[in-house]
Curated annotation (Swiss-Prot):
One of its GO terms (molecular function) is ATP binding. It comes from Pyrococcus abyssi (strain GE5 / Orsay). The keyword Cytoplasm does not apply. This is Uncharacterized ATP-binding protein PYRAB12000. The keyword Ribosomal protein does not apply. InterPro entries: Archaeal_ATPase_domain, ATPase_dom, MJ1010-like_2nd, P-loop_NTPase, WH-like_DNA-bd_sf.
Length: 326
């Protein structure tokens, strides 16, 4: 369900209106609407653009060959050129040939599209799933080198990479090979005004919308799920969501012991009084809290905060329960 991302859409449209020159990383807290935004962006592009939107979420990728196969899709012989694809269309039977040098094939393919007067837009969603694959060297570095060649060197295609994994993004942000060759675009949860507009425009009363904002904040996935549970009172839904999220955080905390547990509790306790804090080097407690989707780290701003408003409430309740249990 798409709603009021005109500012972000305008920014994305501005990026593709000029010659390709940088890789654009779209990032943000979990479930903040990055995928939905990029799909809507793809739909709105004029016919001069051809979009290749490849989502790696849920794909079983164990080695480089698996990733390359995900990039491509079988092309029917009679199929005409479309505006949008979920993979790079190739004739049946040539995949093994492409596996020998996939990046050369893609470069020549995008060059062919350019020569026809159209502009390729490559979107890779949830790219972090290949972050640690090693074949000769890290696949991710091969891929970044290729993206730099497509954008900065050859100006053949616009490249967008989306991720909710802020540890992966931290690694990318500090990567020397991408300095001056990449930009970062935050896709955040809705603010209060947008949240209230979204909920009231979809049937909730102003009072119900304010209750939802108090508990859930502006995370689109939570709000959409709330709207789909129309038979449940808004406050009941919100309290149940908070109970469930608190239990999830407690389950994660119960796996820790000793010094690490104390350090994580010390970190999370800072959010009783603060919505966000600054951070320096990534400590083990920050890495753990981010990896368990409790906190969101923004490497561009060096800010650390709960993944959302619901998570902030759940952190407070989880810490209270821990104090009562020990």
């Amino acid at each position: 369900m798409f709603f009021d991302r005109e500012k972000e859409l305008e920014e994305l449209t501005d990026l593709v209106s000029s010659k390709p020159s940088m890789i654009t990383f779209t990032y943000g807290p979990i479930n903040s609407g990055k995928t939905t935004l990029l799909i809507e962006f793809s739909k709105r592009l004029p016919r001069e653009y051809i979009v290749f939107n490849i989502n790696l979420r849920g794909r079983f990728i164990r080695e480089e060959k698996d990733f390359i196969k995900v990039l491509f899709m079988k092309k029917e012989e009679s199929e005409s050129i479309k505006n949008s694809y979920k993979g790079i269309p190739i004739p049946e039977g040539i995949l093994n040939e492409i596996l020998e040098n996939p990046f050369l094939f893609l470069e020549e393919y995008f060059e062919e599209i350019n020569n026809s007067g159209r502009i390729p837009v490559l979107i890779l969603d949830e790219l972090q799933v290949i972050g640690d694959l090693r074949i000769d060297d890290l696949l991710i570095y091969k891929l970044f080198n290729f993206f730099v060649r497509l954008t900065k060197e050859l100006h053949l295609a616009h490249v967008f990479v989306a991720t909710s994994d802020s540890l992966f993004l931290e690694r990318v942000h500090g990567e020397a090979m991408l300095h001056g060759r990449s930009r970062f675009m935050l896709v955040d949860d809705f603010d209060e005004r947008t949240t209230l507009e979204f909920l009231t425009s979809n049937g909730l009363s102003e009072e119900e919308a304010k209750i939802a904002w108090h508990y859930l904040g502006g995370k689109p996935s939570y709000l959409v799920d709330l709207l789909q549970r129309s038979r449940i009172r808004v406050e009941d839904y919100c309290k149940e969501a908070l109970k469930w999220r608190t239990s999830q955080i407690l389950d994660s905390l119960y796996t820790l012991k000793g010094r690490k547990l104390r350090k994580v509790i010390e970190l999370l306790s800072k959010f009783r009084e603060n919505d966000e804090i600054t951070y320096g080097p990534l400590s083990e407690e920050i890495v753990w809290s981010v990896r368990n989707n409790i906190l969101f780290a923004d490497p561009r701003e060096r800010k650390l905060r709960p993944q959302g408003r619901l998570e902030k409430h759940a952190i407070e309740l989880a810490l209270e329960k821990l104090r009562n249990n020990f």
